[in-house]
UniProtKB/Swiss-Prot annotation:
Function: This is one of the three pore-forming subunits of the heterotrimeric epithelial sodium channel (ENaC), a critical regulator of sodium balance and fluid homeostasis. ENaC operates in epithelial tissues, where it mediates the electrodiffusion of sodium ions from extracellular fluid through the apical membrane of cells, with water following osmotically.
Extracellular side: 98-548
Transmembrane segments: 77-97, 549-569
Record-given protein name: Epithelial sodium channel subunit alpha
Region listing for Disordered, in residue ranges: 1-34
Family: Belongs to the amiloride-sensitive sodium channel (TC 1.A.6) family. SCNN1A subfamily.
UniProt keyword Membrane, yes or no: yes
Amino acid sequence: MGTASRGGSVKAEKMPEGEKTRQCKQETEQQQKEDEREGLIEFYGSYQDVFQFFCSNTTIHGAIRLVCSKKNKMKTAFWSVLFILTFGLMYWQFGILYREYFSYPVNLNLNLNSDRLTFPAVTLCTLNPYRYSAIRKKLDELDQITHQTLLDLYDYNMSLARSDGSAQFSHRRTSRSLLHHVQRHPLRRQKRDNLVSLPENSPSVDKNDWKIGFVLCSENNEDCFHQTYSSGVDAVREWYSFHYINILAQMPDAKDLDESDFENFIYACRFNEATCDKANYTHFHHPLYGNCYTFNDNSSSLWTSSLPGINNGLSLVVRTEQNDFIPLLSTVTGARVMVHDQNEPAFMDDGGFNVRPGIETSISMRKEMTERLGGSYSDCTEDGSDVPVQNLYSSRYTEQVCIRSCFQLNMVKRCSCAYYFYPLPDGAEYCDYTKHVAWGYCYYKLLAEFKADVLGCFHKCRKPCKMTEYQLSAGYSRWPSAVSEDWVFYMLSQQNKYNITSKRNGVAKVNIFFEEWNYKTNGESPAFTVVTLLSQLGNQWSLWFGSSVLSVMELAELILDFTVITFILAFRWFRSKQWHSSPAPPPNSHDNTAFQDEASGLDAPHRFTVEAVVTTLPSYNSLEPCGPSKDGETGLE
């Protein structure tokens, strides 16, 4: 193997000064171009870079002050506090705006419309329940018990007050009927002063601390309570009505009304100066208000009014005699009238009023329509389909329809029978104490819970979004007048072939008409829409920062940059921690084992010889520093 000298020198060839300067300049420019070249994704190296770039380039007013005044710490602190305070005030205003928006306020719009008006439905009742001739046998027993009760409590003999001859006959007949009633219903009898017998679970009028009421007990008589009244008249009527309902429940459906029933009650009917006919009304029977007739309820041919005034409305002459009235059930005379919208049931006890005999009652109407916003703006319902109460009426949804249906459904569920005044649900039967012994106790308990809204009916039944109401005002005058009553009564008796014996107390006249041609519509519109919200937010942003939508995007970009750099720094910290905690790699098989375990405690170091062939090195002009050296040459000695 050949040998080589241990030493030597390599001398580089000297490059001209101009060439070296030119080459260094080219390399510097190339490096600057590489530094200025922007990649597809570039990012900041620290939070300070992000914040400084944002403050230097944003269009938000005041942000540049945080950078420009960095040499003055007092100004920097002042502008920082002012910037944060401004942001806080702005977002406080934002919170107020959002709270107002999500409260869903509405504006009330009042419109006055002029158009042909559809005449409402009008229901008129006789205030005469089932006549004595229809259920006299069923009522005799109840009358005798009531007569005896009045005699016990007030020392008033009702039979003698009416007529002496009929009183003796009625008393004998009632006694036989009462005995027959007790034999047919083998219940426990309760002795009273004059041996008046009452069924065991039948309410009985009682006198306690000058309060009149009746006792109601559960089926096993373990729980009883007094339904008391401050007025004896109210107590007797309520008690009588309770038994009257039981009598109606034991009877088949009300008899069909024919044209003679209508003519016996309605002497004359005109609308828009035209005579009414049978196609203009429907009829039904109310347990307390008697035969009822509803005019203009046929949706296929509704009446319309082109002009206001008494001559362009409905005019009725009705009979108000009380020859066959039930005195213990009906204590008023006349007729009862109610104005309501089509396809709505007539709840006479809620919205009706009485018409006096011998009086012409003129009722003027003003139509009002209400349209509410549904959804988030109000708790109204469009058609009741979203209300958790079954509609028992064959009519459209109203709040009163829902409330009564709710009570009836709870009545069937709790008492196992239905209240006679309300529609009958499928599969149920009306309450009758011959079948449901303690239904009265259950009913009055349930009624108290209903009035206190324990049943939740008032909460479940929501208002409809669209309603039509009629504002009524009435005027009264004597009819007919003293100078014209003779010929008026004569003509009515000849026309209807009926002899009016009581004259003035036997008839009444009713006029129902529109007061004005206009009708009012109360509507709702959103008071704070999305457009209004965005406008208010923009106004607040411009007020506090004088910026635009793009400034908001800059702020969103800043938040995104802070999020990304936080993720990057966290990722770097995690990788660095993982790299420092990893063990050293094992030595490779080609490594020189002479350098392993150098400090293992050996006595003498290993000796080795390295032989190399030294040749002349090439010239590396790029390694020379740009600019002249001290000696004017570059090389290795």
